[in-house]
């Protein structure tokens, strides 16, 4: 696609040649110009050649103020406008040149610009006038070439319009491509191609054309409205809000833009509020806000999917594993490679001790986001936890969840310690079994009530396992002699043998 900016750049690169052509065409024409106007023209010419367009423009403004009938000043100002991409202003100045001095050069240049704007009839009038007025061979050749080009462009336009009306958008697009390669400043053609792109499911290309149209046509509220609608349908509420505001800057009473603005602003506010709650760790509040998002916009599926993705995250972070797995799965049914949902469901699986499922989710996430350090660390942790679960799982020993509070852990420990105290058993075999069980129960309590030891265990490292400690003796080794006489209900005092009596 040829952008307006690119075309202006190419035209700008041809300006020194046009200036030389002008000076040759009007050699000696500046004789008789008053000194101040001549000075302004010369300064403007030098600045234009140096590419200092804004400064050059101010000098040509001054020259025209000093002599409003100076066609050279208008021509040079038109040249600056052209370099700045202001084709409408350039055409006005070229029309003034034609009015002041019937001239082939200015007519040809104006015809070129009119053709780039898609004004075929007006461009053809200029080219035909050149041909009628005894032009030089080069001028005649150029005018005839442009006239032929204009006829061909009109033929292509007729075909494109016919294809569009027949809803054959696939056929219309290449025809419009060919026309817009020449008519780079035709806003209506860009809007027509944008409509074709929308129908063909290519919203990003439609946005590109509509943005160009918004720049080419002043007060183009319709283009801004359409851009905002497309962004909204894509789920980009922030860009949608930005574009609809541009529409309202041009016309604050624009009904469609104002209606869309209210909707997007409300949705945007809810999403921003929900994200702020997430940053603060207020997950229940964030879930409530995202529920509101789905109620605010029930008709655009992407918002429900994004809301559920964030609810999945909140539930996982809030250690509501069962609910998190349900919501994350709903998201993944729609988007099987959604990396965020895969990570959050993996974490929820870990809370439920479903290590293999967590590993599978992390591996899928990694396949779709290879350089994500969080995924790599999560996968390694899940693999360690699977290996750990095949050895000794302190949570399972006490029969508590991974997110159990300290009070729950102590309560479970006391119950099991009283149940499995070896003094409760008579036979030697039963005592040995109880001793082993009791040691595991006491070890589980030791690890899970110590924040640092629990953190290590949750990361997949057993702080009481010599192998996990990477060499050396196990500083946490325990046997029955260590625990003999230990009171699971006491908080101090000397050791004693705990006896149970049942009536």
From Swiss-Prot:
One of its GO terms (biological process) is protein folding in endoplasmic reticulum. GO terms for molecular function: misfolded protein binding; protein kinase binding; protein kinase inhibitor activity; protein-folding chaperone binding. TPR repeats lie at residues 37-70, 71-104, 105-137, 153-186, 187-220, 221-254, 267-300, 305-338, 339-372. It is found in: Endoplasmic reticulum. One of its GO terms (cellular component) is cytosol. InterPro entries: DnaJ_C3_Co-chaperones (IPR051727), DnaJ_domain (IPR001623), J_dom_sf (IPR036869), TPR-like_helical_dom_sf (IPR011990), TPR_rpt (IPR019734). Keywords: Chaperone, Disulfide bond, Endoplasmic reticulum, Repeat, Signal, TPR repeat, Unfolded protein response. Residues 374-392 are annotated as: Flexible linker. Gene3D superfamilies: DnaJ domain, Tetratricopeptide repeat domain. Residues 393-461 form the J domain. Disulfide bonds join 247-257, 312-328. It holds the Pfam family DnaJ. The keyword Transferase does not apply. The keyword Cell cycle does not apply. May be involved in the unfolded protein response (UPR) during ER stress. This is DnaJ homolog subfamily C member 3. The lineage of its organism: Eukaryota, Metazoa, Chordata, Craniata, Vertebrata.
């Amino acid at each position: 696609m040829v952008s307006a900016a690119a075309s202006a750049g190419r035209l700008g690169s041809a300006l020194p040649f046009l200036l030389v052509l002008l000076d040759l065409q009007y050699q000696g024409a500046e004789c008789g110009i008053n000194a101040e106007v001549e000075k302004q023209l010369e300064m403007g010419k030098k600045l234009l050649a140096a590419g200092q367009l804004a400064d050059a423009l101010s000098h040509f403004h001054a020259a025209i103020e000093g002599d409003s009938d100076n066609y050279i000043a208008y021509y040079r100002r038109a040249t600056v406008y052209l370099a700045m991409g202001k084709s409408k202003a350039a055409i006005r100045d070229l029309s003034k040149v034609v009015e002041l001095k019937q001239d082939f050069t200015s007519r040809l240049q104006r015809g070129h610009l009119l053709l780039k704007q898609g004004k075929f009839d007006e461009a053809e009038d200029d080219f035909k006038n050149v041909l009628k007025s005894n032009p030089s061979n080069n001028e005649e050749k150029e005018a005839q070439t442009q006239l032929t080009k204009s006829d061909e462009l009109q033929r292509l336009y007729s075909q494109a319009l016919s294809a569009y009306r027949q809803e054959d958008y696939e056929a219309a697009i290449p025809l419009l491509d060919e026309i817009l390669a020449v008519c780079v400043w035709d806003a209506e053609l860009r809007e027509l191609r944008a409509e074709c792109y929308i129908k063909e499911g290519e919203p990003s290309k439609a946005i590109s054309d509509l943005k160009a149209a918004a720049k080419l046509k002043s007060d183009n509220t319709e283009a801004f409205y359409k851009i905002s609608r497309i962004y909204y349908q894509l789920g980009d509420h922030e860009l949608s809000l930005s574009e609809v505001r541009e529409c309202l800057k041009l016309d604050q009473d624009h009904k469609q833009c104002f209606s869309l603005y209210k909707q997007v602003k409300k949705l945007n506010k809810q999403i921003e509020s929900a994200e702020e709650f997430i940053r603060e760790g207020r997950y229940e509040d964030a879930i409530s806000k995202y529920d509101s998002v789905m109620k605010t916009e029930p008709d655009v599926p992407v918002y429900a999917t994004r809301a559920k993705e964030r609810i999945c995250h909140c539930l996982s972070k809030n250690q509501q594993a069962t609910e998190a797995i349900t919501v994350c799965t709903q998201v993944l049914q729609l988007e099987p490679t959604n990396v965020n949902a895969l990570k959050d469901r993996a974490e929820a699986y870990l809370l439920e001790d479903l290590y293999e499922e967590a590993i599978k989710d992390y591996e899928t996430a990694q396949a779709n986001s290879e350089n994500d350090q969080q995924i790599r660390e999560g996968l390694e942790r899940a693999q360690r936890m699977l290996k750990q679960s095949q050895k000794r799982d302190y949570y399972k020993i006490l029969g508590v969840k991974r997110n159990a509070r300290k009070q729950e852990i102590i309560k479970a420990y006391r119950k099991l310690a009283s149940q499995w105290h070896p003094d409760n058993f008579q036979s030697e075999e039963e005592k040995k079994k109880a001793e082993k069980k009791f040691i595991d129960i006491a070890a589980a309590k030791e690890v899970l009530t110590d924040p640092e030891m629990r953190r290590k265990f949750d990361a997949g490292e057993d702080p009481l396992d010599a192998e996990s400690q990477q060499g050396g003796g196990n500083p946490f080794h325990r046997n029955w002699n260590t625990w003999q006489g230990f009171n699971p209900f006491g908080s101090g005092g000397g050791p004693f043998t705990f006896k149970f009596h049942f009536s």
